[in-house]
């Protein structure tokens, strides 16, 4: 390769490189912004101040709050039912271990009753 062909190559490829560099830079920036989808954690400066994104964020927060409240209600109900069942089992065990021979456990009402009078007793 002659030395005179090097300046000719630079004259041809330098403008191409100058045009290609900003395009390559822009492609990388677009590829990075394409990874920021809804629900992912992305940081942007001043770009999301439009009313639609604020409304979507408000609706998302409201939906999360409603779901959280509903989950708490379901958990409280399950805990309440478990406590009720647990107390009934403890009362049944106490009735069965009672020294009173006339005490028996009534499963329908979940009470310890006296065989003779039918009244509730505390063993």
From Swiss-Prot:
Signal peptide: 1-31
Alphabetized Pfam families for the sequence: DUF1283
InterPro entries: DUF1283
Region (Disordered): 47-66
Keywords: Signal
Keyword Metal-binding appears in the UniProt entry: no
Family: Belongs to the UPF0482 family.
NCBIfam families named among the record's database cross-references: PRK13659.1
Name this polypeptide is given: UPF0482 protein YE2026
Source species of the chain: Yersinia enterocolitica serotype O:8 / biotype 1B (strain NCTC 13174 / 8081)
